Amino acid sequence: MRSEEEIKTAYAQINSLYKDAVNGDEKAVQALHQTLEQVRSNHANIPLLNAYHGSIMILIARDKTNPLEKLRWSKAGLKLLDDAVIFSPQNFMIRLLRGKAAHKLPEKHFNRGHTAIDDYTFLIKSHERGKGFLNSKAYWQLIYELGEVYYRMGRNQDAGICWRKLKNETQDPAFQRLLLSKLKLVEGKPAVETRTEPEGPFASLLRRIVNEAQNQIPDNSQQTT
C-alpha cells in the first residue's frame, strides 16, 4: 500500500471506530491500536496519528485490570500525547485528545490536572476568538469538565467561575440543576484548598506501584498487547 493510501485508511478507521473505542468497545480499541502501530512504524513523524495512538493507549490502560499494566500503558500514551503537542502545539484535535486523556486520569496518581487545564483553556479561548472546530455543545462540555478538574485540584473559585458561566448561558433545565448541584460543592469554601479523597484497597495498591515502579518503567510507546 502506498504511503498516502495507508495514512488515508488509518484516518478512515479512526473516524469509524474511535467513538466506539471511547465508549468502551474493547475490540475497537484493539483494532485501532493495531492499525496505528502499523502505520506509525512507517510514518513516525505525523503528530496527529501519534496523538490518536497515545489516546488509544490510554483506553488500553482503562481496560487493563492489572495496576502495573494500567500504569505502563498510561505512561506510554501520555508520552505520545505530550510529544505530539510539542511538535504541533496549535493543532486543536491534538490538544483535545491530550486534554480529554488528562481529564480522565486520577489526579492523585498521575498529577495531570495541569495538562487538562492548559489544553482545555487553549481550546476554550480559541473558540471564543472564533477559531477551532468546537460546536456549542462541545464548548460547554469543555467548560464543565474544566470546572471538574479545578474542583479535583482544590481550586474552588476557578471551578465556580466555570460552572457559573455555564449556568448563565444555558437554558436547559436539567443542565441548570446539575450546575446548581456543582455550585453547592464550592459554596462557602476557600478559593483554594487541599482536597483529599478516601483511598480504597485498589487505589492504595496503585499508589504503591506508582511510587516503586515509576522510575523503572521503560518507554512502551511501541508496546503491543
Where would I find each of the regions flagged by the language model?
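N-terminal leader/linker segments that initiate helical-solenoid repeat arrays
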Residues: 1-40, 47
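Flexible helix-coil transition and linker loops at the boundaries of alpha-helical arrays
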Residues: 3, 37-50, 82-91, 124-136, ...
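Helix-turn-helix repeat elements of alpha-solenoid scaffolds
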Residues: 21-36, 70-79, 112-125
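Terminal, low-structured helical/coil segments at or just beyond the last alpha-helical repeat
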Residues: 133, 137-142, 149-225
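Alpha-helical adaptor scaffolds
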Residues: 58-61, 82, 93, 98-140
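Short coil/turn linking the two alpha-helices of tandem helical-hairpin repeats
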Residues: 19-22, 54, 59-68, 104-110, ...
